[in-house]
Regions:
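Residues in and immediately flanking transmembrane alpha helices
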Residues: 66, 131, 200-203
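Active-site nucleotide/adenylate-binding loops and adjacent lid/helix of ATP-dependent enzymes
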Residues: 1-115, 133-136, 142-158
């Protein structure tokens, strides 16, 4: 890349801050309680539902089989499968407390299509945003939820971005609204890897990115 006169927007260390979920320690008060080893789940939580995933990826479209666990016993079975998964296993399997989110519909495999949004940031400045679930069938509830997201959700995401902008320049904040009306961080992603999900206009996104980087589009 350097030989081409270019540079990475995020360094390897900055990428690892996202990929290893080091961000969790900076945002633990605004996201789901998370345990990086299943054995660390406290006994007080072992009768409750958990969500299992890799540090970066998940099998969310196999929700009932490989992500949602009704209790610790079910989580242990799913963890075995995920540890043997070629994509998830090398990342390390984590467990998160299941918090019911505002849900618009479900897929055939049980995946909840929730009130979740993706926001891109560069150096703490908001670039673009859109609804997270590009595969939703009925957009009506999304449009009903949009005003509250743009008023409350974006303000919440901006606050989150301000807290971690010194750690990584280009990143995505995925946020969702719980059934009780609270906004939470679902996860962070490296902006160089995160998809536009069919809900963020590519031309507008790359124009904004180019402007903020001070570099013309090739």
């Amino acid at each position: 890349i350097q030989n081409l006169g270019s540079r990475l927007v995020n360094s390897t260390m900055e990428h690892q801050y996202i990929a290893n979920m080091d961000w969790y320690w900076d945002l633990s008060d605004v996201t789901f309680p998370t345990w990086f080893r299943l054995s660390d789940v406290p006994f007080s939580e072992r009768g409750s539902a958990l969500v299992l995933k890799g540090r970066t990826n998940s099998r969310k479209f196999e929700w009932n089989q490989k992500m949602f666990a009704r209790n610790f016993e079910a989580a242990s079975r799913i963890a075995v499968e995920l540890n043997n998964d070629g994509l998830i296993g090398p990342q390390g399997v984590i467990a998160r407390k299941y918090v019911p989110l505002e849900t618009f519909e479900h897929t055939l495999t049980g995946t909840p299509i929730t009130n979740e949004w993706r926001i891109f940031y560069l150096n703490g400045q908001r670039l673009a945003w859109g609804y997270y679930w590009g595969n939703i069938e009925d957009l009506a509830p999304v449009e009903r939820a949009r005003p509250a997201f743009e008023k409350e959700g974006l303000a919440f995401a901006d606050t989150v971005a301000g807290r971690i902008a010194s750690q990584v320049p280009f990143f995505v904040v995925d946020i969702a609204r719980t059934q009780e009306g609270q906004w939470l961080v679902v996860e962070l992603n490296d902006g160089c890897q995160a998809g536009l999900n069919g809900t963020i206009d590519p031309a507008s996104f790359y124009a904004a990115l180019s402007q903020h980087l001070g570099a013309p589009l090739a």
